Regions:
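Flexible, acidic/histidine-containing loops and adjacent segments that form or flank the divalent-metal
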Residues: 43-97
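Metal-dependent catalytic neighborhoods of phosphoester/phosphodiester hydrolases
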Residues: 33-42, 189-197
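Pre-active-site segment of Zn-dependent metallo-hydrolases
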Residues: 1-27, 33-41, 119-126
Length: 217
């Protein structure tokens, strides 16, 4: 995306980035490795994360201190400022967190919940009070991985609520004006045009995230 490309006019450093900070939902290795790609950030890279996530990623401090360094910031269940016009809060989940963002000027809200192992009461409330919902669409079924790799963990064991028997009907009833499945695993059949599974999702009024997707509130 052009807005995120380095070496913009007025930028400090040839490999600098307009990314002002990173919000981590958990300490998955995919997230940690992504932080290393931002090592040339100036000034220090700002990371918002739960205490458990920061503890699990202590090792990355010793790596990035030789480059940009890290400025850790705590997250809370109350709305806190992210920028002049955006506030956000944490929704605590088992083994992860979700984030709800709010445009302080328009009042519009967005929920980002890519790792949902359980539909908690707090998460249900956040879904029903958000204008846009980006929700965990990692797996279509509970045993999706075992079908291609015997012995693999189930969806719930990997902290993901499957679509078919978990989130589809729940999101169908959500009043959000846009609902989007994100964090899709490459085994998920909803990625393939023309599949029965994709049709079920689309008939429920739920979008399927794609590369380069932009959402305007």
């Amino acid at each position: 995306m052009p807005q995120l490309q380095p070496h913009r006019p007025g930028a400090v450093g040839l490999r600098n980035t307009p990314i002002a900070g990173v919000l981590l939902t958990n300490a998955d290795i995919d997230h940690a490795l992504g932080l290393l790609l931002l090592r040339e950030q100036e000034p220090p890279l700002v990371i918002y994360a739960a205490d458990e996530t920061r503890t699990a990623l202590e090792w990355i401090d010793s790596v990035l201190v030789k480059f940009s360094g890290i400025e850790w910031r705590k997250i809370t269940a109350e709305f806190q400022s992210l920028s002049d016009s955006i506030g956000f809060r944490m929704i605590k989940l088992p083994r992860s967190v979700a984030f709800q963002f709010r445009d302080t000027k328009s009042g519009a809200t967005v929920l980002f919940a890519p790792s949902v192992g359980k539909l908690t009461d707090e998460l249900r409330d956040a879904v029903h009070t958000s204008d846009v919902v980006l929700f965990d669409g990692t797996f279509w079924s509970e045993d999706e991985l075992t079908a291609v790799r015997p012995g693999a963990r189930s969806a719930h064991e990997m902290n993901h609520l499957p679509i078919r028997d978990g989130s589809l009907e729940f999101l169908r009833q959500s009043p959000a004006r846009r609902k989007v499945y994100t964090h899709l695993n490459n085994t998920n059949p909803i990625l393939m045009p023309g599949t029965r599974e994709r049709a079920h999702v689309e008939q429920a009024g739920i979008e399927i995230a794609r590369d380069g997707l932009e959402i305007v509130l």
